[in-house]
């Protein structure tokens, strides 16, 4: 079975790192990107198949729900 590809998006680096450490314990998960930048996340999704996005909904300067809609529209 191919590992699930995951993006972690949170503005706090320590939160991103903590989530990644937890996910790395599972060999069926590959973290493709850790970022606090919505543009970087969208670029990654455009260029790579991603199975799951872990997204902080309280992002400074970014409407997380609008970002979710953009992500959904990329996959249509």
Residue ranges, per PLM feature:
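Conserved acidic segment of CheY-like receiver
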Residues: 3-14, 19, 23, 53
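Hydrophobic C-terminal alpha-helix "anchor/cap" residues
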Residues: 23-24, 71
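Short beta-to-alpha connector loops in regulatory alpha/beta signaling domains
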Residues: 30-36
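Acidic, metal-coordinating helix/loop segments flanking the phosphotransfer/catalytic sites
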Residues: 36-52
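Active-site residues of response regulator receiver
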Residues: 56-57
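Short amphipathic alpha-helix used as the core "switch/output" element in two-component signaling
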Residues: 65-76
